[in-house]
A protein has these predicted regions:
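Short, small-residue-biased leader/transition segments that mark boundaries at the very start
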Residues: 1-2
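Short, charge-patterned binding micro-sites
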Residues: 9-35
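Flexible, gly/pro- and Lys/Arg-enriched active-site loops
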Residues: 18-27, 41-134
Length: 134
């Protein structure tokens, strides 16, 4: 359970090939929108706690993982620290992020590029979408 937060929307699940050169089974991707009282760093700590409860061990960057919970947007906040960058780095080039996100909030504008989620998905080069879905 996510502390001091409430899930508002949940996307359909999307099975894709592993990303980042990881040798493991296909990924199952999804997105959820929450309303939270947590600050960004607190939210990240809560997400890491949930990952650990589900057996995630962070031994290798881009290594195999049982669960990977990321903050993609936090309203229209632009934020950067040693542990967290919002909006999520390179999310506009990741089909497995944009596809489920477009189900929840297609008209949300990226606070840096000012493009909507639907625009970013439509503008993805074919080579980033082909072969993504398993």
């Amino acid at each position: 359970m996510l502390f001091r937060s409430r899930v508002e929307k949940v996307s359909e699940l999307l099975e894709t090939l592993p990303y980042g050169g990881v040798e493991q089974n296909n990924f199952v991707n999804g997105m959820f929108e929450i309303r939270t009282l947590l600050a960004p760093e607190e939210l990240l700590q809560e997400l890491h706690r949930i990952e650990q409860m589900e057996g995630r061990e962070r031994k290798i960057h881009w290594g195999p993982r049982t669960l990977d919970l990321d903050i993609i947007f936090y309203d229209d906040l632009i934020y950067s620290s040693e542990d967290l960058v919002i909006p999520h780095v390179d999310m506009e080039n990741r089909y497995f992020v944009l596809k489920p996100l477009s189900e929840l909030t297609p008209n949300f504008r990226h606070p840096i590029t000012h493009k909507t989620v639907a625009q970013m998905l439509a503008e993805l080069p074919v080579d980033l979408t082909e072969g993504s879905e398993a």
